[in-house]
């Protein structure tokens, strides 16, 4: 995804580890998702694809912090420019839970709560072989799938 997007625009990646790439349109900086190095309302587009569910669990060298995921979401909301977009994807299931040393799974309702203050533009659910709507997802009997969400910040 990042390499594809970098063909269209400059990408700035923030991670606890420096990203090594030869692509000139990807700039990497070391940082913490719970304390982003940007001013309020300054970033037009943010994405977190299979990242925020890990924050605070220590799996990738970060500090243990039960509220790490929410802190990262709050930081994304803080730096997002008005009318900007946040694209996020992470495990979504029927129950909220932490899978030890792996990831968090959130219900769709918890997702809406965590991103309160932003407007939900679209949501889809990724299965291994297709992308489905919320209505279709609600009919499934699966422990979890990947929720894909598009939010914006209104004035």
Can you describe what each PLM-predicted range is?
Residues 1-35:
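Class I SAM-dependent methyltransferase SAM/SAH-binding core
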Residues 34-47:
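A short acidic, Gly/Pro-enriched loop at the edge of an enzyme's catalytic core
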Residues 47, 52, 56:
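A conserved beta-strand element that flanks and buttresses the S-adenosyl-L-methionine
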Residues 57-69, 97-103:
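Short, flexible/disordered intra-domain loops and linkers
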Residues 64-85:
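A short glycine-rich, Lys/Arg-flanked "PGG" loop and its adjoining helix->strand segment in the class I
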Residues 88-90:
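Acidic carboxylate diad motif detector
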Residues 102-124:
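Short alpha-helix
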Residues 134-155:
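Core SAM-dependent methyltransferase catalytic element
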């Amino acid at each position: 995804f990042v390499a594809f997007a970098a063909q269209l625009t400059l990408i700035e990646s923030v991670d606890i580890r420096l990203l090594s790439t030869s692509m000139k349109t990807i700039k990497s900086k070391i940082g913490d998702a719970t304390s982003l190095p940007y001013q309020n309302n300054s970033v037009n587009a943010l994405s977190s694809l299979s990242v925020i569910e890990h924050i605070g669990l220590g799996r990738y060298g970060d500090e243990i912090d039960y509220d790490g995921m929410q802190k990262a979401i709050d930081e994304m909301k803080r730096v997002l420019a008005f009318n900007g977009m946040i694209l996020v994807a992470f495990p979504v299931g029927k129950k909220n839970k932490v899978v030890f040393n792996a990831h968090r799974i959130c219900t769709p309702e918890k997702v809406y709560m965590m991103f309160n203050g932003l407007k939900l533009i679209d949501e889809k659910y990724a299965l291994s072989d297709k992308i489905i709507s919320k209505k279709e997802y609600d009919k499934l009997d699966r422990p979890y799938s990947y929720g894909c969400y598009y939010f914006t910040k209104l004035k």
